[in-house]
Amino acid sequence: MQRRHFLKNAAAALAALGLPALPPWALAAKAVGLRRLGQPQPFDYAWLKGQARALAKAPYKSHKQVLPGPLESLNWDQYQSIRYRQDHALWADGNGKFQAKFFHLGLYFHTPVHIYDIVDGKAQQLAYDPAAFDYGRSGLGGKQLPKDLGFAGFRLNTRKDTDRDFSAFLGASYFRAVGKEGQYGQSARGLAIDTGTGGPEEFPDFIAYYLEQPADDSDTVVVYGLLDSPSVSGAYRFAITNGEVLVMDIDSALYPRKAIERLGIGPCTSMYQTGENDRRMDWDWRPEIHDTDGLAMWTGGGEWIWRPLCNPPHLRFNMFVDENPRGFGLLQRDRNFDHYQDDGVFYEKRPCLWVEPKSGWGKGSVQLVEIPTVDETFDNIVAFWNPQAKPQPGQELLMGYRLYWGAHPPASSPLAHCVATRTGLGGIVGQKRSHFSWRFAVDFAGGELAALAKDPKAKVEAVLQVSRGTTEIVSARPLHELKGYRAMFDLVPPDEGTQQIDIRLFLRANGKPLTETWLYQWTPPPASERKIY
């Protein structure tokens, strides 16, 4: 499948999540019991793993289907006008804290998802019912659609706030969640396969969800998912705890059908068009456009790393080799409205997503894929864990991790962290430039920097390494407005080529590191574009 086409559609559809399900007048209707199929059957996670294992032993069959013509021909606005009725919400007739509503098939969503309700350890399939939907401006009516159509996915909301969801599962293996800010942003996936290899990427599908009815006093919703694709099948358990930071405790069991070249565990999918450090696509009136601005990593060896994101001119792939990582994630550190000026999509409220392994993951690498994009409708950033050992047919791969969705990750370095990265033409203002160079200004705050910034005797130095080229005008000086420090340097390319240059920087004093490690990858412009003015 072509990644750009798939993700452009998925990003557009997911962008509308969190909209009210129906106008307020429809929310007060009395709950209606949902129609169910068959008889309740015993269910637990071990049984679901058995189902996934059996799938992997059989030849793969596509789960996509040809939809009725009226659904195939829906445009974006028509599809978005189809809303699930509050009076048909799952668990609406109970006393618990949560409810679930369902997404309709149509537009980009052609894979029916079977959804089951689990009560007292027994699962029963929920029947698609056209009467459960308000078809809005779609031009559709219940009589036009088959009664066995199926669903596209589901969303969760609290009983106290029925018109806003806090998590949604829709399209392939994509899902999203929000923290207290209530603003959707980046997505997660159940699995990534062959992302950034240069060849076709495979997008596994969740083909069934099992929603366990929570106890009335529970703050957690448990969801199970059955995943399938040409290369692998899998069973997932999500324990979703809603709060200021939403936490998903995830267990997955994967069963490969064939060897997988690049397996991505805990994949985060985001968007970066333009920002302080990368203005290649800055023709928009808004100063910055991104769901997240950097990849943070806490390595197995205890090092904290910050890698600002870019919108590169060509596909860019980076791997950060590690063993038993403690965590990683795509973060939105810049939370200042003035830096975005968008009062429609509120980029400053977009959630960070932190991946925390529950046990040792062994050897592998955190991998980052950055894809060129011309606008914000394309999710062009992916980060995931790739095990060093390639999965083989017949194996069982068990992976457990937690996802944290919120304004800040649950763990942070005691050292100072990077708060901004800016770049521009190098040289000394007022003096004629004899050669091309590119300036980097990296701001750090936190840790011991506030105290050191006040100490005239403090000797803070920038420790800088580059893979190619030379550096000049290197400095580290107090930045009192931030109660921190600014490191600055110019990078001179070694030749007229455009080969990427890797940069590594941190601040230290008295031989001791003061900051997390800042990593960057810079692509020098072609010789024809190197203006020195």
UniProtKB/Swiss-Prot annotation:
Alphabetical list of InterPro entries matching this protein: Gal_mutarotase_sf_dom, GH-type_carb-bd, Glucan_biosyn_MdoD, Glucan_biosyn_MdoG/MdoD, Glucan_biosyn_MdoG_C, Ig-like_fold, Ig_E-set, TAT_signal
Source species taxonomy: Bacteria, Pseudomonadati, Pseudomonadota, Gammaproteobacteria, Lysobacterales
Species of origin: Xanthomonas campestris pv. campestris (strain ATCC 33913 / DSM 3586 / NCPPB 528 / LMG 568 / P 25)
Major subcellular location class: periplasm
Keywords, in A-Z order: Periplasm, Signal
Gene from which this protein is expressed: opgD
Biological role stated in the UniProt entry: Probably involved in the control of the structural glucose backbone of osmoregulated periplasmic glucans (OPGs).
Descriptive protein name: Glucans biosynthesis protein D
Molecular function as annotated in GO: carbohydrate binding; catalytic activity
PANTHER family the UniProt entry points to: GLUCANS BIOSYNTHESIS PROTEIN, GLUCANS BIOSYNTHESIS PROTEIN D
HAMAP family in alphabetical order: MdoD_OpgD
